[in-house]
């Protein structure tokens, strides 16, 4: 339907304004007769411009004379013929006998279903003229022309009937004749092209080739009319030497229109005239070089001769050639350059208004890019043209068996084009494009015309597989790498191991000590007597320095000596006199001395000298001195001892320990600190924080491990070794402790290099200044004795400011004793590991300041706590080994002061009496008679095998679960990797013993449950307070050595599976023989408990808590049976809970928690029943 503003009646030719307006608006019209044509409505090669109001007065060349716009609507010729093509072409692929049943292009089928002419208008405006000749439309199939055009092309010269439809035989003969003629022409053409290619230039050759194709089309397209004289064809090239006046062309359109109205039909062209037209066209093209690879590029005959004659047709083609010279630039490049040139098109195309047949050709050209991108079209056209040329040369004799005809009456170029169109119909453009992605394009012949962008288009194989990333499922890859990444993400506190071979460390100086002359002149005898006087110093190592006697002999700086004088240190202590010269000589040292002997100063003073010798810290550099301690209290104590020296020496120290906010410690480290006093765990946190950018160990050259034995034994060995591995290997390492068990020496030597071992006063000895009292008392009399001791201490005025420290074994005991003492009027506080770090710090500060005189503590305060006024230490609960006793007693009597240590022993603590008696003997004090009797009694039991002697040292407490887990892991590995040959006899013996034990436990538990009073609601025979029986998972019978036993077990297994008997029958052990079964299991029947109790042990929240706490597996099995009903044979057993775990301890803890929940739920159900009203809510009157 015509758009607004158009009129159906043709306007006079002279009406330029109306003509131009209608021409513009025709751009937006989609004519009804063309609705099924599958091609665009526009008839011009010129770029389309959207209709805008501002374009009305501007110049716009006419597309076509408005007077001639309805010529194709002639009732006698066009309309009846167009009706044949107006049907829906999707209904059948057989649309007529004149079609060779060729496969239809998929894109044309799709394109005809929608009116996308407006969308295609933008795309075709950007397509270069060179690409239009290689359209998809031409490469897919030969689009059927209207009936009049077919008549003109296929009719004989003497047949003027325009509507005659030729038969299939005639058409086939005609095509074969064209093919043979084209073969002859091709040989001569190829030679001429090679000669021309040598003399032709690059870009000019390309444009001339395009012009040649455009100029050739009028002569090859269709036969000429017999009424058209041959002189018209001869004169065709002449008018195109220059440009035309648009007005003159518009005037010449009037007689042409009149002739069209009179003639009313097309006229066939005689054969004689066709020859002259061909020769003329050949002369025109003689001087134009061509590209050999593009010889067959014109894929469609474009010379459809209309009622205006051949001259008009060729004029339009030549004008298009001139436009091509201006606008064609190649494939991708043309889109960008044409966008700049399009606003001012040349006026050579202005006479397109006179040529309706040219508009039909434009339709053909425009149609080539519909529904696809220009890059794909160009690639498809190139590939199709190259393959077509090779195929035509190789298979010219095989085209439908029609290659024998030689008398071709039509022009050779026309035959070539028709054959090309037919061959290209057989190749789908999509297949051609996809094949180009996989196959390498055949090498192009070198000619003057080359596409500069051809290489850049090769990476457009975006649909190919060769460049795709290797997309592999996670499960198919390396699962170990994936798990390693996941584990790495979880280990937030891991610090990377440093490769010291690749690090460049600065050299540093270790040796600062120069032996004084008076010590150098000392003989060996004098040296031995001196060491004996200094509490019997024992040294072990090579070339150990002699002990100093005065601070001036240590080689210290003036600032350090001034601080020492201010602190009141008159002479070095025994450990200081021997350790300071050894450390300042650059040696690694192991120092063992009694408590309160000044070990802290012994390693601090050499460290200050060590740090001052090196260059100052720069921004973001780590510390130089690193001091690690096992407890937070000891860390704060060492940091406090450093402060007097730090101010004088202009150094900085940071105390880093757990429990305190890490952000404050990070801020202090970022400001820079030469010394870090830390606990191992917090140091690893700081090293791993912020991807290692908080601090580093690159400048650490001096490392101190204070109380090293406790640090290694408390489980800090992995952390300590990890930190030490990141410190440079040539560091200086110092270890100090009051006790040093022999099994710790091997661990200490891992971190030291040829150390000097210094032992002062013997290992693990209580200082002689401490008065030790050991009393054997019952549990109920210990508190009264404690009150007596405290009363005696504070009764005298001289002890008014004295402090008392009371040690207990457990946190609960500390809080209980605190409550009792507060009731008796003693102001006191407690400290243990269960309190927050800030509370622990404030409590120790208050205790030192005298805010309260009595402190109750566990062994956490046994080390590093230095209070000068501490006069009394009470071991309310006896220490369990010698080293702990030494450290507890060593809290008093420090720095030469006197003190008292009182220890309470109960009669059942014979095991601890041995170590206490040994400590008394080593310190030179008498062992009380009751204590000696306990020692003798215990040793007798050890000889009789009733008791096992305890080993000295910090063995640790509460590690049974860790041991069981370690053993379980070892057994699991043994089961996984065993060959079935080892250890069978021992395991069988263990199983027999366990089975006997289980039977005994069952009998015992049944007796206990029968005698114990039962809770209301608890089923008969179930004792929630009785012993928990944990079973070891039954071993698979397949492990038996005897083959007959294996056969028998297999038969029994088969029978059990077939009959389903014994699998889920009441009273049979649970089925936990699967691969996921734990090493231990236990069952708890809950079927007969009240509903509240059953819910307490089966709801997800409670079960999740137990699982998290114990690490077991809890499964509800069986079926619920009401009270009084029993499961029959073959039925599921009663509802029960199965608990599985890797250790017996874990299963026992889980069962104990489940029993507690059952008991609470049963009691709650009984209470709710008791509170419930007797009757209902309503009464029936």
UniProtKB/Swiss-Prot annotation:
Q: Name the enzyme group at the top EC level.
A: hydrolase
Read off the Pfam families from this record: DEAD, Helicase_C, KH_12
**Subcellular location, record wording:** Nucleus
Keyword set includes ATP-binding: yes
Motif range for Q motif? Answer: 549-577
Q: What sequence ranges are listed for the domain Helicase C-terminal?
A: 785-935
Renumbered to this chain, the Basic and acidic residues biased-composition regions fall at 24-87, 94-155, 168-196, 384-393, 410-420, 958-981
Annotated segments matching region Disordered? 1-243, 275-423, 949-998
Q: Which GO terms describe its cellular component?
A: nucleus
In this protein, which residues make up the domain named Helicase ATP-binding?
Answer: 580-758
What superkingdom heads the lineage? Eukaryota
Q: Which Gene3D superfamilies match?
A: P-loop containing nucleotide triphosphate hydrolases
Instruction: From the UniProt record, list the reaction(s) this protein catalyses.
Output: ATP + H2O = ADP + phosphate + H(+)
Which GO terms are recorded in the biological process aspect for this UniProt protein?
Answer: mRNA processing; RNA splicing
Annotated ATP binding lies at 593-600
Role, per record: ATP-dependent RNA helicase involved spliceosome assembly and in nuclear splicing. Catalyzes an ATP-dependent conformational change of U2 snRNP. Bridges U1 and U2 snRNPs and enables stable U2 snRNP association with intron RNA.
Protein name stated in the entry: Pre-mRNA-processing ATP-dependent RNA helicase prp5
Organism per entry: Aspergillus terreus (strain NIH 2624 / FGSC A1156)
């Amino acid at each position: 339907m015509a758009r607004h503003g158009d009129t159906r009646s043709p306007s006079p030719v002279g009406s330029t304004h109306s003509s131009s307006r209608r021409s513009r608006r025709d751009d937006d019209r989609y004519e009804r007769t063309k609705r099924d044509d599958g091609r665009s409505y526009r008839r011009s090669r010129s770029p389309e411009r959207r209709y805008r109001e501002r374009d009305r007065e501007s110049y716009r060349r006419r597309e076509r004379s408005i007077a001639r716009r309805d010529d194709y609507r002639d009732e006698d010729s066009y309309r009846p013929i167009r009706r044949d093509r107006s049907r829906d072409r999707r209904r059948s692929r057989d649309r007529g006998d004149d079609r060779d049943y060729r496969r239809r292009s998929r894109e044309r089928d799709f394109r005809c279903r929608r009116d996308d002419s407006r969308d295609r208008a933008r795309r075709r405006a950007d397509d270069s003229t060179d690409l239009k000749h290689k359209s998809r439309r031409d490469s897919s199939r030969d689009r059927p022309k209207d009936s009049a055009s077919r008549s003109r092309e296929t009719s004989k010269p003497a047949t003027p009937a325009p509507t005659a439809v030729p038969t299939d035989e005639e058409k086939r003969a005609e095509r074969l004749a064209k093919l043979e003629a084209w073969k002859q022409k091709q040989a001569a053409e190829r030679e001429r092209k090679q000669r021309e290619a040598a003399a032709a230039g690059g870009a000019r050759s390309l444009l001339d080739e395009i012009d040649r194709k455009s100029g050739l089309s009028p002569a090859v397209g269709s036969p000429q009319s017999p009424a058209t004289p041959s002189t018209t064809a001869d004169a065709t090239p002449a008018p195109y030497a220059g440009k035309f006046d648009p007005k003159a062309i518009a005037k010449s359109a009037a007689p042409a229109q009149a002739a069209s109205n009179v003639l009313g039909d097309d006229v066939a062209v005689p054969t004689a005239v066709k020859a002259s037209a061909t020769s003329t066209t050949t002369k025109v093209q003689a001087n134009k070089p061509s590209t050999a690879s593009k010889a067959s590029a014109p894929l469609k005959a474009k010379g459809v001769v209309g009622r205006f004659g051949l001259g008009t047709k060729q004029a339009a083609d030549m004008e298009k050639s001139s436009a091509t010279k201006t606008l064609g630039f190649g494939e991708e490049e043309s889109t960008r350059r044409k966008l700049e040139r399009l606003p001012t098109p040349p006026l050579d195309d202005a006479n397109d208004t006179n040529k309706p047949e040219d508009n039909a050709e434009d339709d053909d050209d425009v149609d080539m890019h519909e529904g696809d991108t220009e890059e794909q079209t160009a690639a498809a056209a190139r590939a199709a043209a190259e393959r077509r040329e090779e195929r035509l040369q190789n298979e010219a004799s095989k085209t439908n068996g029609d290659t024998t005809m030689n008398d071709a009456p039509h022009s050779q170029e026309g035959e070539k084009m028709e054959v090309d169109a037919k061959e290209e119909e057989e190749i789908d453009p999509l297949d051609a494009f996809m094949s180009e992605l996989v196959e390498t394009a055949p090498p192009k012949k070198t000619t003057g015309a080359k596409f500069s962008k051809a290489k850049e288009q090769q990476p457009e194989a975006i649909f190919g597989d060769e460049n795709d990333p290797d997309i592999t499922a996670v499960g198919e890859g390396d699962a170990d790498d994936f798990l390693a990444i996941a584990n790495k993400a979880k280990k937030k506190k891991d610090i990377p191991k440093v490769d010291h071979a690749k690090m460049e460390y600065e050299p540093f100086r270790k040796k600062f000590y120069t032996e004084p002359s008076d010590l150098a002149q000392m003989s060996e005898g004098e040296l031995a007597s001196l060491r004996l006087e200094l509490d019997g110093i024992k040294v072990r190592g090579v070339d150990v320095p002699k002990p100093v006697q005065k601070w001036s002999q240590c080689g210290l700086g003036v600032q350090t000596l001034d601080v020492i004088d201010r602190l009141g240190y008159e002479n070095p202590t025994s450990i200081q006199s021997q350790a300071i010269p050894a450390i300042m000589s650059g040696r690694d040292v192991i120092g063992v001395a009694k408590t309160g002997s000044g070990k802290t100063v012994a390693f601090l003073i050499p460290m200050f000298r060590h740090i001052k010798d090196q260059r100052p810290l720069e921004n973001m550099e780590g510390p130089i001195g690193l001091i690690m301690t096992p407890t937070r209290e000891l860390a704060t104590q060492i940091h406090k001892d450093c402060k007097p020296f730090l101010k004088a020496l202009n150094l900085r120290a940071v105390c880093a320990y757990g429990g305190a906010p890490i952000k404050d410690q990070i801020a202090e480290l970022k400001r820079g600190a030469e010394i870090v006093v830390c606990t191992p765990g917090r140091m690893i946190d700081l090293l791993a924080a912020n991807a290692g950018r908080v601090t580093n160990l690159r400048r650490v050259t001096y490392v101190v491990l204070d109380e090293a034995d406790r640090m290694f034994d408390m489980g800090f060995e992995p952390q300590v070794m990890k930190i030490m591995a990141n410190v440079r290997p040539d560091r200086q390492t110092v270890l100090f402790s009051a006790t040093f068990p022999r099994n710790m020496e091997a661990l200490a030597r891992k971190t030291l290099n040829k150390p000097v071992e210094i032992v002062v006063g013997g290992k693990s000895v209580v200082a002689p200044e401490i008065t030790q009292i050991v009393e054997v008392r019952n549990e109920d009399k210990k508190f009264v004795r404690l009150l007596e001791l405290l009363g005696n201490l504070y009764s005298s005025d001289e002890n008014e400011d004295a402090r008392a420290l009371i040690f207990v074994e457990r946190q609960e005991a500390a809080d209980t004793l605190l409550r009792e003492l507060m009731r008796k009027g003693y102001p006191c506080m407690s400290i243990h590991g269960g309190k927050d770090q800030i509370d622990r710090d404030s409590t120790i500060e208050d205790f030192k300041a005298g805010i309260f005189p009595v402190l109750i503590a566990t062994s956490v305060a046994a080390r590093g706590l230095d209070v000068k006024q501490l006069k009394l230490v009470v071991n309310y609960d006896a220490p369990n080994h010698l080293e702990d006793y030494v450290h507890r007693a060593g809290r008093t009597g420090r720095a030469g002061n006197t003190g008292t240590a009182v220890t309470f022993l109960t009669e059942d603590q014979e095991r601890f009496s041995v170590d206490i008696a040994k400590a008394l003997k080593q310190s030179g004090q008498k062992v009380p008679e009751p204590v000696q009797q306990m020692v003798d009694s215990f040793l007798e039991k050890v000889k009789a095998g009733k008791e096992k002697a305890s080993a000295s040292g910090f063995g640790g407490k509460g590690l049974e679960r860790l041991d069981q887990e370690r053993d379980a892991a070892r057994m699991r590995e043994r089961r996984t990797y065993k060959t079935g040959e080892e250890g069978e006899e021992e395991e069988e013996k263990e199983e027999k013993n366990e089975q006997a034990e289980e039977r005994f436990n069952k009998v015992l538990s049944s007796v206990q449950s029968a005698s114990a009073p039962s809770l209301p609601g608890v089923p008969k025979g179930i004792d929630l307070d009785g012993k928990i029986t944990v079973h070891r998972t039954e071993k698979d019978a397949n492990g038996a050595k005897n083959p007959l036993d294996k056969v028998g077990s297999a038969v029994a297994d088969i029978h059990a599976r077939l009959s389903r008997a014994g699998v889920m029958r009441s009273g049979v052990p649970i089925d936990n023989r699967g691969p996921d079964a734990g090493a231990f299991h236990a069952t708890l029947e809950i079927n007969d408990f009240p509903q509240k109790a059953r819910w307490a042990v089966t709801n997800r929240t409670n079960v999740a808590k137990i699982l998290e706490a114990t690490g077991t597996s809890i499964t509800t099995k069986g079926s619920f049976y009401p009270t009084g009903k029993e499961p029959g044979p073959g039925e599921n057993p009663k509802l029960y809970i199965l608990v599985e775990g890797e250790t017996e301890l874990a299963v026992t803890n889980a069962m104990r928690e489940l029993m507690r929940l059952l008991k609470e739920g049963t009691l709650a159900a009984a209470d709710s029943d008791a509170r419930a009203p007797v009757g209902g809510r309503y009464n029936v009157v």
